[in-house]
Amino acid sequence: MNYKISIIVPFFYKEKIVGENIPDFDLLSFNKCLSAIFKSKYKNYEVILVSDNSSPSSIKLTKKYPYKLIKLKKNNGAANARNQGAKLASGQILVFLDSDVEIKDNSLTIINNYNNKKNNVGILQGVYSHKPNYNSMTQYVHSYQCYHVFFETKKKKYTETLCTCFVAIKKKYFFKVKGFNSNFSGAETEDLDLGYRLMEKNHKIQLEQRLKTIHHTNYGILYFIKKIVSRHTSEMKMYLRNKKDIFKRTQQLSHTPVLISIILIAIKILIIFGNFFYKIPNFNEILISLIFLFILTNIKFLKFLLNSKGFLVAVRSAFYMFFHFFLLMMCIVFGILDFYVFRNKY
């Protein structure tokens, strides 16, 4: 059976105006995303673009492609945009794709063939490739995602991580859990939340290594900080809303090396801070030992980087990783404060 596949791509773009914050959107990457879709060998599909109150110029770019377009008058976030796209979809399978992600020409064929098998999964999760090789920070981020989110689960058949970079879901399962939670105002953890609710209904998420994508995002330091703080503060609050699952179901914090690394960084900060008030014996030796333990804890990931990206990227990534885990530690603090003190549940 050739299932009809509805590909839903939300996007948000505003013209650059002096004094206005510019959203994270790249018109060139958007064009690559659309071009890749329409090169698909599988032809029984439709494309639904959801403009989340974007500027007209981004819509003009897409005129050469056949698609359905939804123009939202108000920017309410990716969760709401994807829900609106799903309501218009006529396919039996929904594919959610980020606007800066490029898929392979056989991806839709793989999705259709899989759904012809008798199983209770109904959800296929795509994965990031190592490409493209922009700056060293971008290479670190892509490698981290490949390793901690996807590579570590390569030997497993299923995953608890649903990521809307590229995921295929049977439409009946999607609406069974009422779609994405539109309380998430930005592009935060609405995908993880949907994955958890699907799993609660006994729908498994299969990690499909053949569904490799190219993620066209170039990370700078400020963009990196913004994305980490936004997503993982929201992630922490999600765990607090579902306290019974806080240890059972996590994305990054469940990985033992990540958790140990965060604890080591917290200890190091406490020791440095405490040394200002009380001279700690063997202070330098303790710090060196903590750094050694940090590297040892993440040695498999660093070897993974060394083999895939080379020596220089691996060395730089050790520093990025320390900063990354420091931000994760701060996100835990921010999330707890925002949830309990400021009463912000989302």
Q: Predicted segments — roles?
A:
Residues N181-G186, E190-F247:
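Catalytic donor/gating beta->alpha subdomain of glycosyltransferases that bind UDP-sugars
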Residues L94:
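Short aromatic/hydrophobic "clamp" motif used to bind/position activated sugar donors
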Residues H130, F151-I169, S185-A187, D193, ...:
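A recurrent flexible, glycine/aromatic-enriched loop bordering the glycosyltransferase active site
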Residues I221-I286, L306-V315, Y346:
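Basic/Trp-rich segment in TM-proximal cytosolic loops or flexible interdomain/linker regions
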Residues L27-N44:
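Short, acidic, metal-binding catalytic loop of nucleotide-sugar glycosyltransferases
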Residues L72-A89:
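Glycine-rich, basic loop-to-helix element that forms the pyrophosphate-binding segment
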Residues E102, N106-T138, H216:
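Conserved donor NDP-sugar-binding/catalytic core segment of glycosyltransferases
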Residues A36, S51-I59, D98-E102:
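A conserved acidic beta->alpha catalytic loop
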